């Protein structure tokens, strides 16, 4: 039998009368619980609870502002109702002539005992919060901008006390205040995580019978998860990921968006990412990317990107159909979703043959090639190129698709000329590794000057080597060799890089380029290098036993000797 809820008192004097009635009933129960004749074991447990209640009531009476707290206006009437019900039950258990049903009496006793336990918990929570020692606690007033940490801490404790003890309206108002606090003060999230009961807040995510409370709680948990490392850690450690994934799976559109934000934030910590699989969240995230709103898709694919580096989850992504969903987001998602999807595809493409094959089977390579032409975001382009590079090395078939696409090769050449350093390096790496046709090499010959400039840059690591390999590949075409030596600035840069005193570049790189220029035997190419002063530097590098220098200097010197002998013969 459920205890009835008494009408809240309307004045302090009425509340005092109510407290007196509670004390009177409690005193009676403390004695009668020791003299009952039936269910003695249950009454012994109840006696212990009643003793604790007596202590709590005494503490409330000693609190200077207890009558001002609105929670007591509901708690005390409910408590009196429970005690009065227990008094009636104790009379029945004491009466030797009681002829009622034992099972019914036992059930009523257990229900009243459970109600008393809940009310004890609420009173204990209220006392521990310290709010009964503060004045004007009837109105939950937001601390002002100049409030100190102590005032803010009290506000948060009071807020969570109302949230845990109060009814639905108390909960809604407390959550509304919490959301205002988190929105108005970014730094408050850490204090909320420290002073508030985040575990209870997470419990409200499964508050299905009160959608309004559940929605507000989801917004609050999402804000905490996204605020900073400290509050995010508390949300995860208090078990927030599981309920958030359930909301992402079956909540309303608005709730799914908030849940996706939180899941992305939580999984940003590599130490948390593994748990997605434990909660069965891979399939949930994939479905959110497939059918969610644009906002949900953006954050869900961000979460997938976060977990894609976890070895066990990579295979799960393939098995749950993530690849076609990610490839679709590459062409249909907003800019942020595109960037995250491209990043994830790049990770998967570098993760083994199984995932690379899935990407190729879904025509992922063609979509990536198309994106190189259409996307202006440098970050997204970087991920796309990394994915392309991984796929290009997976099979001869994919390499042929790339090298035979004139449009793609021309776009790569444009990135070498106009992209940032990372894009230039990745593009140069592709040019140097693909078996590009002579026609396509001629089509991008104009990027050779940019490649020479890149050879001078010591950072990022590997840039000089990539630029050199791309140049050597392009210089297998005669017209490109002639075009490069006609570029006086590029020739002078090469000669300066050959100088042993120049330590900004490893000498093998410019030597490889010079060797590629003179390999065709063109007199004009050699003459321009000689006129620019390449020979003495090469000679010195040969003496230093730099790889390739001896052969390169022989080619230059051989041509020079032929010229001398020709002049002597004519004379």
Predicted feature residues:
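Buried hydrophobic core positions in alpha-solenoid tandem helical repeats
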Residues: 155-160, 200-203, 243-246, 282-286, ...
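Leucine-rich repeat
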Residues: 186-187, 229, 270-271, 311-312, ...
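N-terminal segments that cap or nucleate solenoid repeat domains
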Residues: 147-191, 197-200, 204
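Alpha-helical bundle protein-protein interaction modules that mediate dimerization/oligomerization
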Residues: 68-148
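Amphipathic, heptad-repeat alpha-helical segments
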Residues: 36-69
